[in-house]
């Protein structure tokens, strides 16, 4: 159970586990600070509140836009600046949105309604097995269905985009569904297969990073609809955009692989302390963020983000982690996050800074 402390900043910290001496030294010399920005209610202290922000899950932003938050608990998307200021737009996203991405193309991922058609600027996956798109020229207040895989029982927990494709992590069917620019289902030569992932684990989080697709795997519950959080459960893989396995980045069965229903993924930029350039992996299960550095064809555990007194950051119900765009969504060296604290009954939007 997390212990929350809310001084001028909001930080939940837990100290457990064993790390290597080298990792410990890096962590001690590299403190981070958590800042609460917006929550759904006063029970989760933050400078601002927004009742729609319940179980905030996915985060996306364009090159200059504010953050778009996928609020799984209210089936909405709300917008925030990097400073935590709410933008006066709330979009309805049916089915409990999870992952979200920005689309910069004026011709890809077209949605239609009442004789109008237009490219979706922001896209969402939901737990009902659909991909929806928001187009301001078609319907300014509601995201519209572009692809529907509910008929095969799909449960989409995440969404990524690369080139003119969408990648949705289908947790129920333990696969990655890929859609072309017209929302048509695509079969790729690689198929996003890793024979070393045991049965009972399924694609959970998914992000396009550094030209490749990174996928986290979590343990399925009996119905194969929700994750089973527990220390030491999970994997992270790297694939090409064609679904060919590049590397198994993290195997929780090995030493120094502290996964616990990991979902969030981000590449740290220059200026993010000693973990600059590393792959950051955020756990939903215990709220911790671990760093991995690429070393040739392998990835090496470097440690976890910690506050000044050495205890690891632990954000209750942690989902998305993503860096700002240098414009409306905040500095490129600031790591933003969404979470669903209190058993996903609340929501928090915040940031993490180095130093």
Model-inferred region functions:
Residues 21-355:
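Sequence/structural signature of beta-propeller domains
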């Amino acid at each position: 159970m997390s212990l929350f402390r809310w001084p001028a900043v909001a930080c939940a910290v837990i100290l457990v586990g064993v790390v290597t001496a080298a990792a410990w030294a890096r962590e001690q010399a590299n403190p981070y600070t958590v800042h609460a920005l917006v929550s759904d209610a006063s029970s989760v202290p933050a400078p601002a509140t927004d009742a729609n922000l319940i179980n905030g899950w996915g985060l996306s932003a364009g090159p200059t836009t504010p953050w778009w938050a996928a609020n799984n608990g209210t089936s909405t998307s709300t917008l925030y600046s990097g400073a935590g200021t709410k933008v006066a737009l709330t979009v309805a996203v049916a089915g409990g949105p999870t992952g979200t991405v920005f689309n910069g193309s004026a011709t890809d991922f077209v949605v239609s309604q009442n004789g109008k058609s237009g490219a979706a600027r922001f896209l969402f996956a939901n737990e009902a097995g659909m991909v929806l798109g928001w187009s301001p020229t078609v319907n300014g207040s509601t995201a519209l269905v572009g692809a529907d895989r509910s008929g095969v029982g799909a449960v989409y927990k995440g969404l990524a985009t690369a080139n003119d494709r969408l990648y949705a992590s289908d947790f129920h069917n333990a696969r990655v569904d890929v859609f072309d620019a017209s929302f048509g289902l695509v079969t790729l030569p690689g198929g996003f297969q890793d024979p070393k992932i045991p049965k009972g684990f399924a694609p959970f989080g998914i992000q396009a990073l550094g030209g490749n697709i990174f996928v986290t795997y979590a343990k399925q519950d009996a119905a194969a609809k929700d994750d089973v959080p527990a220390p030491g459960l999970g994997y992270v893989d790297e694939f090409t955009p064609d679904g060919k396995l590049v590397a198994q980045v993290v195997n929780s069965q090995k030493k120094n692989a502290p996964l616990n229903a990991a979902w969030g993924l981000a590449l740290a930029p220059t200026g993010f302390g000693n973990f600059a350039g590393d792959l950051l992996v955020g756990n939903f299960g215990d709220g911790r963020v671990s760093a991995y550095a690429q070393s040739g064809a392998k990835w090496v555990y470097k440690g976890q983000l910690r506050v000044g007194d050495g205890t690891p950051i632990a954000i209750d119900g942690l989902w998305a982690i993503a860096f700002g765009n240098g414009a409306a969504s905040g500095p490129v060296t600031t790591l933003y996050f969404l979470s669903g604290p209190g058993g996903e009954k609340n929501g928090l939007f915040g940031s993490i800074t180095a130093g």
